[in-house]
């Protein structure tokens, strides 16, 4: 399988070196919100490689390690002599201090976790427009005991004397808090200060610029070859369809494989929307029985994902021979998909970065090794909010742009355990009620995802003076900005009551509705 080459090839203005923080990608997203392109690289990226990339700034992420630990992850010390501005965040600040001759130790007093008011001592370029007393998010058990030569304090908190520091002449900055999280009220002001005032970046990472570059890169990669797109009807594949149509016109063929795991009425909606309303021809393939047959007796969620992903590509290969030839397979893979399928962390025993696979993503984890297509994935460096902006700019209607995310394997991973036709019918009806009621309440666009999950157990109930023994449905509603982290949505009680009453009365085989109040982390948004 060839590696995708349709990422944007522009050099990043800001490079984030990742030391294992759960917020590393969030830092990248915040920088991009300032219309400055950023990427996340491993902490071991050499100073020479960074010199060749020539970013205007470097950000060192936080991380779970202690800089004085035996196998602590370290950056190339040559970074300090590149003449490139550096901002260290939490662990990144401590690493900067230690490598440049300062002292970092375990906090002797009270460790600082959560919100803390920041007292600004020196409103330099980094802290311009950062209000004195503004709330910042702390999460550290170590602290700076002595600053390196040439460094000065910029701000402090009640428990952290060196909450923000700098070597002003060398443009080396460190903050002990996390400006990237929403809890830091002036965090974005600080990030903008670093990006614009310290680094001198230009705000040129715009939707229009991305579209122009992506179109040019797709044309360069594909040439006069034909491209086959797996169209699902979600915002990702729909945006991709519009982008590819703009780039290569009739060289694009969209194929919708109905694997039987879509939500109620979606196959019909999809065909009408693209084929008739927007004149983008879609080949409809009914493969419902083929997919359900492959999942017979399968209960392991990872195996289900891989079977669906493999079978999906097999159908593509077969249909491409009938409709083709095609050289490229287009996929709507996004940045969080890649991260979640092969996340990285630091092994505290060895200091090495290791893969921590949470779950295979349908686009990137279930592909067979003998894939006959080359991949074109022009969206794989975008976050979901960026994809929505691209979709709007390309003319995609709000009905599609603001649809809730839906996993590639569909309802098959919202049915825990074995997937059957009976369970699919049950879940479709329950899921439709959830979405109908949330839309009726005017909350659909305030929620990241809202859906139903069918559990592989039965519970006792009483309906019409008779004992029932039926499946429970889980109501899963979460709020998020990008899907990387999420909190459970606080729905009104009367809305939850309406949803529950409708499901147990209208959906055959269900006698109980429960609410999932787990955030991500520790849970994931989907149950499988």
From Swiss-Prot:
Q: List positions binding ATP.
A: 232-238
Indicate whether ATP-binding appears among the record's keywords.
yes
PROSITE patterns tied to this protein? GATASE_TYPE_1 (PS51273), GMPS_ATP_PPASE (PS51553)
EC annotation? Answer: 6.3.5.2
Q: In which pathway does it act?
A: Purine metabolism; GMP biosynthesis; GMP from XMP (L-Gln route): step 1/1
Q: Which keywords does UniProt give here?
A: ATP-binding, Glutamine amidotransferase, GMP biosynthesis, Ligase, Nucleotide-binding, Purine biosynthesis
Q: What class of enzyme is it?
A: ligase
Any one GO CC term of this protein is: cytosol
GO MF term (any one)? ATP binding
The chain positions of domain Glutamine amidotransferase type-1 read 13-204
For this protein, what reaction is catalysed? XMP + L-glutamine + ATP + H2O = GMP + L-glutamate + AMP + diphosphate + 2 H(+)
**Where do the catalytic residues lie?**
90, 178, 180
Q: Which InterPro entries match?
A: Class_I_gatase-like (IPR029062), GATASE (IPR017926), GMP_synth_C (IPR001674), GMP_synth_GATase (IPR004739), GMP_synthase (IPR022955), GMPS_ATP_PPase_dom (IPR025777), Rossmann-like_a/b/a_fold (IPR014729)
Keyword match Nucleotide-binding: yes
The residue ranges of the GMPS ATP-PPase domain are 205-403
Q: Looking at the Swiss-Prot or TrEMBL record, what is one Pfam family this protein matches?
A: GMP_synt_C
Judging by the UniProt lineage, the source's domain of life is Bacteria
* Function per UniProt: Catalyzes the synthesis of GMP from XMP.
Oligomeric state and partners?
Homodimer.
Q: What is this protein called?
A: GMP synthase [glutamine-hydrolyzing]
Q: Name the gene.
A: guaA
